[in-house]
Curated annotation (Swiss-Prot):
Organism: Acinetobacter baumannii (strain ATCC 17978 / DSM 105126 / CIP 53.77 / LMG 1025 / NCDC KC755 / 5377)
InterPro entries to which the protein is assigned, alphabetical: AAA+_ATPase, DNA_recomb/repair_RecA, DNA_recomb/repair_RecA_CS, P-loop_NTPase, RecA-like_C, RecA-like_N, RecA_ATP-bd, RecA_C_sf
Gene name tied to this protein: recA
Family that this chain belongs to: Belongs to the RecA family.
Classification via Pfam families: RecA, RecA_C
SMART domains per the UniProt record, alphabetical: AAA
Subcellular location per the Swiss-Prot or TrEMBL entry: Cytoplasm
GO biological process: DNA recombination; DNA repair; SOS response
Binding site for ATP: G65, P66, E67, S68, S69, G70, K71, T72
Annotated GO CC locations: cytosol
Molecular function (Gene Ontology), one example: ATP binding
Keywords: ATP-binding, Cytoplasm, DNA damage, DNA recombination, DNA repair, DNA-binding, Nucleotide-binding, SOS response
Function, as annotated: Can catalyze the hydrolysis of ATP in the presence of single-stranded DNA, the ATP-dependent uptake of single-stranded DNA by duplex DNA, and the ATP-dependent hybridization of homologous single-stranded DNAs. It interacts with LexA causing its activation and leading to its autocatalytic cleavage.
The protein, known as: Protein RecA
PROSITE patterns membership: RECA_1 (PS00321), RECA_2 (PS50162), RECA_3 (PS50163)
Length: 349
């Protein structure tokens, strides 16, 4: 750089530091790059599809999909995983529909979960921002964007038009929350619903509520869909679920994860572990028999799941190996669970 330009730059940087504080402007190479902390989603397959082993802390996340597709289940599992690692979590229940007993079944410590049921959208987002700014919260869930009703709409008449009020509210709130979340390393997950655009001839007519602001501010956007049923005999015990990573600022996007959500239990974590271990040749499969490090561990997938339930240390060791292999080397295309054997038989725990 020219000497005069260099002096001018130094003078400008000194003035900026004096006015706004140290490290307001810095050279990118001066600081060592720190790995982004991730919170597991409770599904190993989805953690791998996200590329960093889970959802990133300090970022805005959007999870959207049709009704009863597993959106709240996914966020409650993320809360449970965050609490296991010593984190403090909050759930802003704008829909007034949180079931404490179901949350407990998914592993959430409900005695230490902060819950708020706000009266209107402004109150919900103000509470979220204050919790983020406190620096004491690791994960906040807002359920859901569609239920963040502006105060003017609540106080108005039923037939009144309130065009764009919710979109403006979300845009204003996200401008504040995004920077605060990064500074306090707090993850904020927004659950969103799907609506249909009228008169769309080409392309998908689906859109999410709350305007476009959340689409821009979110570092990760997950589209969750129920694609089938899980049966045990004639009884339906869960749903086959597909999650597409629609947007990902942390790793390559557009990967997919297919896994099972069992009613009242959450994701079929050990079932995923068995399939991924076979896929990565960590566990060997010959006919119906599965073996690990030369020792047979079970005949049939359900017996292997039972073996992992009884030998948690081995299950954790295999999971670590899978994460090391797939998150280091990366995966191409969709990360899927292919259930070759016993497709509709699941272990009742």
């Amino acid at each position: 750089m020219d000497e005069n330009k260099s002096k001018a730059l130094q003078a400008a940087l000194s003035q900026i530091e004096k006015q706004f504080g140290k490290n307001t402007v810095m050279r990118l190479g001066d600081n060592t790059v720190q790995a982004v902390e991730a919170v597991s989603t409770g599904s190993l397959t989805l953690d791998i599809a996200l590329g960093i082993g889970g959802l990133p802390k300090g970022r805005i996340i959007e999870i959207y999909g049709p009704e009863s597709s597993g959106k709240t289940t996914m966020t409650l599992q993320a809360i449970a995983q965050c609490q296991k690692s010593g984190g403090t979590c909050a759930f802003i229940d704008a829909e007034h529909a949180l079931d404490p007993q179901y949350a407990r079944k998914l592993g959430v410590d409900i005695d230490n979960l902060l819950v708020s049921q706000p009266d209107n959208g402004e109150q919900a987002l103000e509470i979220a921002d204050m919790l983020v700014r406190s620096g004491a919260i690791d994960l906040i869930v807002v359920d859901s964007v569609a239920a963040l009703t502006p105060k003017a709409e609540i106080e108005g008449e039923m037939g009144d038009s309130h065009m764009g009020l919710q979109a403006r509210l979300m845009s204003q709130a996200l401008r504040k929350i995004t920077g605060n979340a990064k500074r306090s390393n707090c993850m904020v997950i927004f659950i969103n619903q799907i609506r249909m655009k009228i008169g769309v001839m080409f392309g998908s007519p689906e859109t999410t509520t709350g305007g476009n602001a959340l689409k821009f501010y979110a570092s990760v956007r997950l589209d969750i869909r129920r694609i089938g049923q899980v049966k045990e005999g004639d009884e339906i015990v869960g749903s086959e679920t597909k999650v597409k990573v629609v947007k990902n600022k942390m790793a390559p996007p557009f990967k997919e994860a297919i896994f099972q959500i069992l009613y009242g239990k959450g994701t079929n974590q050990l079932g995923e572990l068995v399939d991924l271990a076979v896929q990565q040749d960590i566990v060997q499969k010959a006919g119906a028999w599965y073996s690990y490090q030369g020792n047979k561990i079970g005949q049939g997938k359900n017996n292997v799941i039972r073996y992992f339930e009884e030998n948690t240390q081995i299950a954790e060791e295999i999971e670590r190996n899978i994460r090391e292999q797939l998150l280091t080397t990366g995966t191409n295309g969709a990360v899927q669970i292919e259930d070759e054997e016993e497709p509709d038989l699941l272990l009742e725990s």
